[in-house]
């Protein structure tokens, strides 16, 4: 009798194992094959963009150039070339981390945001994420060098609320789950 119970336990265990394997295998076979999950991400950082509209060949601007390592004169051309490269690469996501502007000049943020929006229109489905850096908000060094008398003046600084409004096309996107 013991042999029969032992054989019955073996048979029951084998039957349960077959049922278990079958029930787990069928859904796995019926599931869709995994999609190609390649995600192309472009990252840009420390743009230090300075609008050409704020540049004038004055003594104050020359002093600023000689006092700073940022490529103020070249920043617009560099940014243009980088955006052309992004257009050619057609990434799914563009992450632009601060410092976005020279020193948080609101006019520079507005000009950059306009270019980013154009880039987003040129690349269907492109998600753009923008993160401010220490140069981008409440910076007292914001300057405009293109003045009537050739003297640099304080440019309009960007406050956190301004930043969010300027880059509204980013922060109104429901995929952005947290802001400031």
Please tell me what each predicted stretch does:
Residues 30-109:
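N-terminal active-site segment of His-dependent metallophosphoesterases
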Residues 22, 49, 102, 136-137:
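Active-site micro-motifs of SAM-dependent methyltransferase domains
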Residues 111-180:
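Extended active-site neighborhood of metal-dependent phosphoesterases/phosphodiesterases
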Residues 18, 39-42, 126:
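Residue-level detector of short, conserved catalytic/binding motifs and their immediate flanks
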Residues 2-15:
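Bacterial N-terminal signal peptides that target proteins for export
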């Amino acid at each position: 009798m013991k042999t029969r119970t032992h054989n019955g336990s073996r048979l029951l265990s084998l039957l349960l194992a077959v049922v278990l394997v079958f029930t787990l295998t069928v859904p796995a076979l019926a599931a869709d094959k995994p999609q190609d999950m390649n995600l192309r991400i472009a990252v840009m950082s420390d743009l230090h963009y300075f609008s050409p509209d704020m540049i004038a060949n004055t003594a104050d601007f020359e002093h600023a150039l000689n006092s700073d390592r940022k490529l103020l004169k070249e920043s617009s051309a560099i940014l243009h070339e980088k955006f052309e490269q992004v257009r050619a690469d057609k990434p799914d996501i563009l992450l632009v981390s601060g410092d976005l502007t020279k020193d948080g000049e609101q006019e520079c943020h507005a000009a950059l945001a306009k270019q980013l929006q154009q880039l987003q229109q040129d690349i269907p489905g492109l998600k753009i994420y923008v993160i401010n850096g220490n140069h981008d908000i409440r910076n007292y060094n914001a300057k405009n060098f293109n003045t009537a008398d050739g003297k640099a003046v304080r440019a309009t600084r960007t406050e956190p609320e301004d930043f969010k409004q300027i880059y509204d096309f980013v922060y109104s996107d429901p995929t952005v789950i947290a802001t400031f």
